[in-house]
């Protein structure tokens, strides 16, 4: 029986689970992991705790350092899969390289939504908050008494707010919804969490939206 070649795009929880499941059923097949990050597999939900100083990069890892060696995985890190040629069973990378496969798993997770707001390109320091590099970059530019604006009062936005609130910075959250975490909590739950976060010097503008950025100043709608 010919061994299969498995290609996994992504290197987080789903990829780890896939590797372990493959090895339970196929000990000889080749596994290739492609990720646009340069890190060992880690827990993305913990990046806010990294900002808070409650964890470090080593503790964030899903598996031991020898996980890839033990499971005989070939790593392609720091490269992005741009296209899948299903007819030829190839993944085309951003450097032009092609990786063939017999079985392909896309395990990249979600991508942050970036709204189209006039002037956003003029903002000097702007970040999404889903990866370890995002958290490290944000931490590198945070200064004492700085003011941070977070667009969105969902789970990711609030975890970011919680993480940076301990850095002695002013944190402001703006959301179109009239309450925080509206997709997962009822009115009372939202109110309890909001009151708790306000004690950490986090300010909320709810039921509001940003209509324009003028360099590092945000212009909110007229509902003020």
Where are these regions (language model features)?
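FAD-binding core/adjacent interface of flavoenzyme oxidoreductases
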Residues: 1-7, 64-149, 218-224
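Beta1-alpha1 glycine-rich phosphate/pyrophosphate-binding loop at the start
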Residues: 2-74, 161-184, 188
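Glycine-rich Rossmann-fold phosphate-binding loop(s) that bind the pyrophosphate
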Residues: 10-13, 130-131, 152-156
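Short, well-ordered coil/turn elements that cap or connect secondary structure elements
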Residues: 26-28, 68-70, 76, 121-123, ...
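Residue-level marker for beta-strand->alpha-helix junctions and adjacent short loops that shape enzyme
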Residues: 38, 111-112, 211
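A Rossmann-like FAD-binding core segment of flavoenzymes
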Residues: 75-92, 99, 167-224
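Compact, aliphatic and Gly/Pro-tolerant "microcore" segments centered on a short helix or tight beta-hairpin
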Residues: 105, 117, 137-200
């Amino acid at each position: 029986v010919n061994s299969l070649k498995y290609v996994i795009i992504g290197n987080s929880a789903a990829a780890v689970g896939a590797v372990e499941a493959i090895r339970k059923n196929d000990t000889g097949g080749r596994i290739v992991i492609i990720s646009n990050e340069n890190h060992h597999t880690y827990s993305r939900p913990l990046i806010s705790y990294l900002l808070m100083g409650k964890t470090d990069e080593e503790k964030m890892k899903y598996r031991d350092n020898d996980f890839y060696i033990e499971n005989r995985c070939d790593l392609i890190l720091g490269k992005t899969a741009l296209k899948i040629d299903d007819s030829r069973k190839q993944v085309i990378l951003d450097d032009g390289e092609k990786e063939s496969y017999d079985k392909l798993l896309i395990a990249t997770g979600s991508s942050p939504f970036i709204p189209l707001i006039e002037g956003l390109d003029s903002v000097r320091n702007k970040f999404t908050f889903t990866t370890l590099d995002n958290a490290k970059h944000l931490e590198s530019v945070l200064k004492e008494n700085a003011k941070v604006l977070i667009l969105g009062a969902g789970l990711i936005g609030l975890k970011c707010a919680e993480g940076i609130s301990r850095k002695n910075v002013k944190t402001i959250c703006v959301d179109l919804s009239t309450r925080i975490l509206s997709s997962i909590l009822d009115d009372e739950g939202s109110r309890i969490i909001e009151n708790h976060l306000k004690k950490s010097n986090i300010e909320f503008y709810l039921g509001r939206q940003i209509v324009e950025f003028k360099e590092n100043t945000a212009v909110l709608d007229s509902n003020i």
